[in-house]
Amino acid sequence: MATVIQNPLKALGDQFYREAIEHCRSYNARLCAERSVRMPFLDSQTGVAQNNCYIWMEKRHRGPGMAAGQMYTYPARCWRKKRRLHTPLDPQLRLCELRLEAELMAKREAPQTEATALEALLRGDGILDKRNNNAKEEETLLEIQRVLEADENGDGFHDDEDFEVDTPKRKHRNKGRGRGSGRRRTEAVANDDQDKPYVCDNRYKQKHNSKTADSVCGKRYKNRPGLSYHYAHTHLAEEEGEEERETEIPQSPPVHHENHKPQKAPDGSIIPNDYCDFCLGDSGSNRKTGQAEELVSCSDCGRSGHPSCLQFTDNMMQAVRTYQWQCIECKSCSLCGTSENDDQLLFCDDCDRGYHMYCLKPPMTQPPEGSWSCHLCQNLLKDKASGVEDP
């Protein structure tokens, strides 16, 4: 017959029980803190925008019970609107502008003093007091939310730009395949600025290193993914490299030209760079692997990269030596020669050439699943090709 344990603490032990309770409390505190600082998201099942809530209270917010059976009471918090950071985009102010236009004739006949309050509201003068009150409420809410340690919740508060991720439109391309290189054509500077509206202002180095305005990067890209990849693999890599050089023996880094423009030879050809655009190493040293590796250069913009940094396969490393390779920003269709409709570009997994799906024979409507090889690689590699083209 099983024995009945009168007190479970005797079987578990006081120390074990205290540790279990402490771990449970720590887990609940971390879970509540993580939920309180979570970014708003749209629930795909219910279609409801899940947002932050303020139901998490601390022990110091407890008050005595006000009714029978109540042990504690907590202060009630009224519903409040979000603090509006962009005053010119406030929809309430836009409504005021519409009313102002509708009553334009009446306002012209009315005295000038009647419109002073509305004009002050449109200028943003009357929002200062509201912003100060909201700032005080925000500080109170942040005190409730700070349950984690200072080093753990340091990464919890970011700007909206830190969470902004643009998904590239191009299908079936390998990760990291020359994505940070900017398109460099032989056109005029004005056309280059129009084609590439995304400019790297190097805010990170200005914020932490206090560089002057002359040290702004200024590199231009045609889309945001290219700019983001350049920022992460160039400027952040430079910051990490400076921290490593403080603890190691100083070495002469490869020359990295700011405001890079494609250098041309006397015959008009593009002079390739002598450093990798990803790890900033040269042909004698790959900073990621520490080994010597040959650089692969773009024939249009001159940017270079190590095959391992570009995640090239053995077939790609042999194929790029046989034709004028293009980086992901300069990639064009090998059949029609244009880079339009880049969302329809399909990349070969053996030679890295690009093809429009509608330029293929027969044309494709959807990218194939898995690996895909162009007709050139299928004829050359036969059975060693990565994939077989769908009929």
UniProtKB/Swiss-Prot annotation:
Chief localisation class: nucleus
Listed Basic residues bias regions: 169-183
Stored Pfam families: DPF1-3_N, PHD
Protein's UniProt name: Zinc finger protein DPF3
Comment block on domains: The PHD-type zinc fingers mediate the binding to acetylated histones.
Keywords, comma-separated and alphabetical: Activator, Chromatin regulator, Metal-binding, Neurogenesis, Nucleus, Repeat, Repressor, Transcription, Transcription regulation, Zinc, Zinc-finger
Region (Disordered) location: 152-200, 236-266
Top-level lineage group: Eukaryota
Compartments where located: Nucleus
Composition-biased stretches (Acidic residues): 152-165
CDD domains in UniProt: PHD1_DPF2_like, PHD2_d4
Positions annotated as zinc finger (PHD-type): 273-333, 330-380
